[in-house]
Amino acid sequence: MTRLHLAFECQGKRCGATLDNAPGTTGLLLISGGNEIRAGAFNGQARLGAEIAGAGFPVFRFDRRGIGDSEGENRGFRKSRKDIAAALLAFRAIAPQVERVVGFGNCDASSALMLASGAGCDALVLSNPWTIEDDEDDAPPPSAIRSRYAEKLKNPRELMRLVSGKVDLKKLARGLLRAGRTHSASSSLAEGMRAGLAEFAGDAIILLAEGDRTAQVFVERWDADDARIMRCPGADHAYSSEEARAWLRQQILKLLRAQRVK
């Protein structure tokens, strides 16, 4: 594997990028979530890129406009379609052996791919998609709150805290009110993601870290019977544990290998 730092242009603005090159004809385009730089939190995306490239698949990471090494205004994930499309063109130009590209994003990066109907990618790995509107809080969905309270009721220490007055009753009342709802309210963001993904003709998988609030809210707002959903038990949002990281890497490699034989 060789690592190359480079730049490409998106609507007249210079954007920073990194290629972990490999001989494979299927590549991974890694889109950053939130306002993270392309290396990711604690260098996690750089590490993932090196691991995937080590398995024979080139990986292209980039900073969208206004983030990290890139010029311009940060317009957020909802308006990042052109950034993704420009990165895809740059990837194909710098690694001409690449015939098919799998797009991967976590959190709102996966939402961006869904809203953009893949933005030109041939297949998608969509991890913990963000469906929370700007004016909403990111509290757990009703089902997760009910599960948490059920566990507390089994714990004698928690019951003692309740009867001894050590529990904030106002906070408890708010939690019970949330828990009593049948499901989280839908969002226009989730509907837009659903419509965008429906227009995507390639393979797509949806990966959910079961310990992640973002994933829990997504489940409440998505079709529970969607066969594309795969779950990683106990994993957090960033797949921090070695077991979760191995699971994530395995799912990505599986889809990359499936594209290679098409």
Regions flagged by a language model, labelled:
Residues 1-26, 241-242:
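N-terminal cap/lid segment of alpha/beta-hydrolase-fold proteins
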Residues 52, 116-117:
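Aromatic pocket-lining residues of Rossmann-like dinucleotide-binding sites
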Residues 21-63:
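Short, surface-exposed "cap/lid" segments of acyl-processing enzymes
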Residues 35, 63-68, 131, 236:
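Alpha/beta-hydrolase active-site loop signature
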Residues 103-115:
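Glycine-rich nucleophile elbow surrounding the catalytic serine of serine-hydrolase chemistry
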Residues 65-95, 100:
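Catalytic nucleophile-loop/oxyanion-hole region of alpha/beta-hydrolase
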Residues 31-32, 64, 127, 232:
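Alpha/beta-hydrolase
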Residues 120-249, 255, 262:
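The alpha/beta-hydrolase serine catalytic core
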